[in-house]
Swiss-Prot record:
<dbReference type="GO" id="GO:1990481">
    <property type="term" value="P:mRNA pseudouridine synthesis"/>
</dbReference>
<feature type="active site" description="Nucleophile">
    <location>
        <position position="39"/>
    </location>
</feature>
<keyword id="KW-0819">tRNA processing</keyword>
<dbReference type="GO" id="GO:0160148">
    <property type="term" value="F:tRNA pseudouridine(55) synthase activity"/>
</dbReference>
<comment type="function">
    <text>Responsible for synthesis of pseudouridine from uracil-55 in the psi GC loop of transfer RNAs.</text>
</comment>
<protein>
    <recommendedName>
        <fullName>tRNA pseudouridine synthase B</fullName>
        <ecNumber>5.4.99.25</ecNumber>
    </recommendedName>
</protein>
<comment type="similarity">
    <text>Belongs to the pseudouridine synthase TruB family. Type 1 subfamily.</text>
</comment>
<dbReference type="GO" id="GO:0031119">
    <property type="term" value="P:tRNA pseudouridine synthesis"/>
</dbReference>
<keyword id="KW-0413">Isomerase</keyword>
<dbReference type="Pfam" id="PF01509">
    <property type="entry name" value="TruB_N"/>
</dbReference>
<dbReference type="InterPro" id="IPR020103">
    <property type="entry name" value="PsdUridine_synth_cat_dom_sf"/>
</dbReference>
<dbReference type="GO" id="GO:0003723">
    <property type="term" value="F:RNA binding"/>
</dbReference>
<dbReference type="InterPro" id="IPR014780">
    <property type="entry name" value="tRNA_psdUridine_synth_TruB"/>
</dbReference>
<dbReference type="InterPro" id="IPR032819">
    <property type="entry name" value="TruB_C"/>
</dbReference>
<dbReference type="Pfam" id="PF16198">
    <property type="entry name" value="TruB_C_2"/>
</dbReference>
<dbReference type="InterPro" id="IPR002501">
    <property type="entry name" value="PsdUridine_synth_N"/>
</dbReference>
Amino acid sequence: MSNYWLNFYKPKGISSAKLVNIVKKIIGKTKIGHAGTLDVEAEGILPLAVGEATKLIQLLIDAKKTYIFSVKFGAQTDNGDYTGKVIASKNYIPSQEEAYAVCSKFIGNIKQIPPMFSAIKVNGIRAYKLAREGKVVELKPRNVTIYDLKCLNFDKEKAIATYYTECSKGTYIRTLTEDLALSLQSLGFVIELRRTQVGIFKEENAIHIKASDAITKNFIDKKSIKIEAILDDILVLDATDDQAQKIKYGQKCVFDYEEDVNFLWVRYNGTLLAIGSLNKSCFNSLRVFNLL
């Protein structure tokens, strides 16, 4: 069974699920998952987990992400991007100085109200489905972190500014765009959105897929990234034969390590065996991997 990561670049015009299905057809009957949905009209990095790597997807969902996005000032749409219906307009367009200076206001921990057109479930139904039916849904504010935000370019004539941001999981760029525009006494919506990094996965070494591409299983295997790659900066303990057996069968396993650790991974014969925590030298497994 194949167990690895793939660093794909999702183009505009297809859903994240569609990209997963394309890859499934190429590599066959293997479990595949993606680490963080990208909207159909967005493009950029979409890491795919194959086989046992799917057990680590949550780590990437929780990882920092970077985006480059362009804002059109002067109007607001019902879904926050250029595909939506204009629901409000304002003549005021911020100056270049204002477009650059506003960034500092958003760096740090902030609250965001998710957009109506989002995948959040409300009573078991996706918010965007309710929004398409014309139903008004009240979504609660969420805490997110903006680690960096800077303006890369400003076109006064077109009323468009391009920004770069590094942010935490759960950050909605459409909401950030609207809040940023409001802070500038204007309105705004996203006209371009590109995700440039998810954890260790960057766009410069991503696999680009197009309709005309003949991507084969052999090509994908060559582009595969080892399952442990996303664990490189996390504490690892090497297990003995006895410890490995205990972990594999869910038995109590003690390591010669005195400090408590909230998250670490265990390696056996150079291969990922499990992830978990350490409490009073006792390993508590969160996930055990079938790689041996």
